[in-house]
Amino acid sequence: MKVLEKELFGRKLRIEHGKVAKQSLGSVMLTFNESTILVTADASEETVKGQDFFPLTVEFQEKFYAVGKIPGGFIKREGKPSDEAILAARLIDRPIRPLFPENFFNEVQVITTVFSMLNGDSIETWGITGASLALNLSPIPFNGIVAGVRIGYVDGQFIAFPTQEQLKNSKIDMVVAGTKDAVTMVEGESLEVSEEEMVEALMFAQEKIKEIIAIEEEFLSELNIEKWEVQKEIVPEEFIEDYLSLIDEEELKKVLLTKGKKNRDKVISEYKKNVMKKFEEIFLEKWSVAFFEDKKRFLENAFEEKLQDSMRKMIINENKRVDGRTCDEIRDITCEVGLIPRVHGSALFTRGETQSLGTVTLGAPLDVQVLDTIFSDEEKRFMLHYNFPPFSTGEVKRLRGVSRREIGHGHLAERAHKNLIPSDEEFPYTIRVVSDILESNGSSSMASVCSASLALMDAGVPIQKHVAGIAMGLIFENDNFVVLTDILGMEDHLGDMDFKVAGTRDGITAFQMDVKTSQVNKEVLQKALEKAKIARLKILDKMYETIPQPRKELSPYVPIMKVFKIPVSKIGEVIGPGGKNIKEISELYNVEVYIEDDGKVKVTGHNANKVDEAINHIQNLIAQVEKGGIFEGTVKRVEKYGIFVEVLPGKVGMLHVSNLKDKLESFKIGDKVKVEVMKVEDQGKFQLKQLKEEN
């Protein structure tokens, strides 16, 4: 058993190994302040024969006992992971995945289990560090040490692992992961910060990552963990050389420069088949059919590497990309709004071969999403959901539930907008945006940011500014590097970086970066952010040309909502016993009534007259019956000594027989009678007298 305790960022960090989960290949218990996680790393000892991909699974297990809660719902136990848990798992997955050896294809599972959690301890960020420790404590091959840090920016000062209170006042909320040498993963949101502030934040994060890695190194020292050997299947170099000799550089370049994603993919596939066919014709006798069939995948990998090399050289040496653009060019953009009937707001944003349909639905306060996770139990009134159907890339796949990727992309686009959404006081509707990707060739999440902004303005949501997003790429070749603007899917796959940046004309609002190289330094980040700003401003110009400001009127299909206040002391009267009054009003007028703790009442419905009638009903419920008040009441009961008359909803007074103008026998339940209030007693009871109807 090994334990290490350190003071770090004003709180206590404790790392423990060898006490729990001892049958796991690698396990570590990590406690930061009042939050505790167990991270385990396990793997199969053998690779499935012929497997050529790395099956890594990262899970983040929420335990409600960690925050002293019992799960909601009927079953009362943890079920499928929440969106927040999936996002946490993705956050851990992204920085560790590139650090596994290239030829390691064993199945690996990393699980982070939360035992105790205090909001503000950023336990999901510590999951990155925990995963690094667990993998290094195991025999699983893993190249290096990685750590994660959360950064805030309050009053001009950067803060590592800000508290919940500090985050409320922070201009930046970002999670950064990296090695000792470089930042490898970034995710976060900000309040329109500048590119200079962003670079400073990343450099600050890198220094803090070094501090955490130093602690990891101290903990791992003297343990001498023996690692499994990566069973690399060897093929003769001559086998690969024979194959590569059949690929003509100029011909491959022409193939790469084929216009259009579908055409390019088709031409590349045909060229690859032709090269393989030539190889069989010329070299099959030399290598034998059995050897060729067994090792064919190595030739396919060699083709991919050659393709990657050719694309990268073309960019570095000729400033030319596979679709003919220069490195700084954005693909053609078209924007259209109001194209879908009946929806509350819609927009189609197309950038090259990537297309997003954004739609907005405005709902009642009761349409909010009620979160029930260990991270939050709040209500969410702005949601952005992202859908990526298989037809967007011309593929055939089963339509299952929402994928982790869809949750992650939607979350990023949502963060780009969330701090610019009007407050509940300014715009009381619940807002749901959906981005349906209709076509995809790179950066569909940033297209979603743009379509969402256009659709919000089309719906009449009073956002002050448009938000646009762009994805930047990077090609490193020896000591040279080139930053690419608006990357294609192929450039993302074969390049060294995917840096998504969203924002307004005034600054950055959301960002996400994944890096495959350790060469990303301050200079690279500055250049990428500068070019991202230039591109973002060009896209924003197009968007403002399409719709410069929110529409003045909402769609006729949007529910009508009216807001007013009642005294807090009257909330119970309006709700009624067991919600009786609210239910009655909702059914009577076909409306939804929502009452907040401060007495704010929101009434929504599709008929303006019914909404007004419901409001009048509520106001009558809380109206005071005063002496001298004259009402046209309804007879509710008839007794020998008089009748009981309802003058306002729920307000029934006694009209004694001595104060009747008409005979008692002439009254029946439901009759209308004009009355005046004679006396109001302390308990709220009141006495009436009948007034003669005027002819």
Curated annotation (Swiss-Prot):
Annotated ranges, domain KH: 559-618
Broad class of enzyme this protein falls into: transferase
UniProt keyword RNA-binding, yes or no: yes
Main location: cytoplasm
Gene3D superfamilies in UniProt: GHMP Kinase, N-terminal domain, K Homology domain, type 1, Nucleic acid-binding proteins
Known catalytic reactions: RNA(n+1) + phosphate = RNA(n) + a ribonucleoside 5'-diphosphate
EC number: 2.7.7.8
GO MF assignments: 3'-5'-RNA exonuclease activity; magnesium ion binding; polyribonucleotide nucleotidyltransferase activity; RNA binding
Subcellular location: Cytoplasm
Chain positions recorded as Mg(2+) binding sites: D492, D498
Pfam annotation, one family: PNPase
Entry's Gene Ontology BP terms: mRNA catabolic process; RNA processing
Annotated GO CC locations: cytosol
Keywords: Cytoplasm, Magnesium, Metal-binding, Nucleotidyltransferase, RNA-binding, Transferase
Cofactor(s) needed by this chain: Mg(2+)
Residue span, S1 motif domain: 628-691
Protein family membership: Belongs to the polyribonucleotide nucleotidyltransferase family.
HAMAP family the record matches: PNPase (MF_01595)
Main function: Involved in mRNA degradation. Catalyzes the phosphorolysis of single-stranded polyribonucleotides processively in the 3'- to 5'-direction.
Name the record gives this protein: Polyribonucleotide nucleotidyltransferase
Naturally occurring in which organism (per UniProt): Petrotoga mobilis (strain DSM 10674 / SJ95)
Protein encoded by which gene: pnp
